[in-house]
Amino acid sequence: MNINATLFGELLAFIFFVWFCMKFVWPPIMGAIEERQKKIADGLAASERGEKDLELAQAKATEQLKEAKTQAAGIIEQAKKRGSQIVDEETQRAHQERENIIAQGHAEIEAERNRAKEDLRKQVAALAVAGAERILERQIDAAAQSDIVEKLVAEL
């Protein structure tokens, strides 16, 4: 291998080419690569943040759903209790009304019975006086008849 001027010329041209590439070509390429690396890293970080936010949102939604179910169950339980209370109150009121109607009916029956007894006493007294008149074959004066009727009514 001969070292001649061509080899030195090629060596100088290569060194100039390497210097030119290092000075003018390499920095924009490295800047583009670094920028691309940064965009990829930012995208991955955003993706991880998004996944964490999604997990937090899902956990929050699950918790809110549980709370809503608990509240709904509480409202349903309160509604059932209130419904039972209303039914009990109405049942009690109906029983009380029934008792009042029955008591009123008994009072009316008792009053009617007393009126009927009084009418029967008067009729019995009148029949007794009529029978006594026939037996005695004479007319009793009004005062004596009234006395007899009152005594009979009192005895009955």
From Swiss-Prot:
Location of this chain's protein in the cell: Cell inner membrane
Protein name: ATP synthase subunit b 2
The keyword DNA-binding is assigned to this record: no
GO CC term (a single one): proton-transporting ATP synthase complex
InterPro entries: ATP_synth_B-like_membr_sf, ATP_synth_b/b'su_bac/chlpt, ATP_synth_F0_bsu_bac, ATP_synthase_B_chain
Xref: PANTHER family: ATP SYNTHASE SUBUNIT B (PTHR33445:SF1), ATP SYNTHASE SUBUNIT B', CHLOROPLASTIC (PTHR33445)
Encoding gene per record: atpF2
Record organism: Pseudoalteromonas atlantica (strain T6c / ATCC BAA-1087)
Any Pfam family hit: ATP-synt_B
Family: Belongs to the ATPase B chain family.
